[in-house]
């Protein structure tokens, strides 16, 4: 029985960058590391210039005639590109909106479940749409729904900021919360009350 191959010979090769000796074109339009145009020169001459600069010759436009190369620090360039891609991905994630639905007569247990859901969404960097749903004549109790949403924003104030205060939207009342970017500064009265309580106990 023949030995099993150590790797799949038909598997696609990892895409390698077109830099230095991997560039096969005989003539190249070369841009120096400071942006200076070096004009159209031979591959060998371009490689020699890059070697003198202790940098890399990188193919940046293969479709041009002749192809365009730039002399640069490829390792630094690759790092910056990956950093920009990560930042772009992070920013795009923050645009998501998650929704938490409830009734204005919600009990304490279900309310805590909604608080936990909203907390999880906020920690993930998502905005939260808090929705109170009315059925039938319940629409008369918008004041109670507004009170509930304000209570929710208060309970989540350390993690969230109110982006849109409670307001009617059709047969619902909604409020938008966004992850808090700056720490919540507590009022002086809130920080001194525990100290007063300790003095009264002593």
From Swiss-Prot:
Superkingdom assignment: Bacteria
Keyword Protein biosynthesis (UniProt): yes
GO molecular function terms noted in the UniProt entry: ribosome binding; translation initiation factor activity
Principal subcellular localization: cytoplasm
Compartments (UniProt record): Cytoplasm
PROSITE patterns noted in UniProt: IF3
Classification via InterPro entries: T_IF-3_C_sf, T_IF-3_N_sf, Translation_initiation_fac3_CS, Translation_initiation_fac_3, Translation_initiation_fac_3_C, Translation_initiation_fac_3_N
Residue pairs linked by disulfide bridges in the UniProt entry: none
Complexes and interactors: Monomer.
PANTHER family: TRANSLATION INITIATION FACTOR IF-3 (PTHR10938), TRANSLATION INITIATION FACTOR IF-3, MITOCHONDRIAL (PTHR10938:SF0)
Described function: IF-3 binds to the 30S ribosomal subunit and shifts the equilibrium between 70S ribosomes and their 50S and 30S subunits in favor of the free subunits, thus enhancing the availability of 30S subunits on which protein synthesis initiation begins.
Protein name (database record): Translation initiation factor IF-3
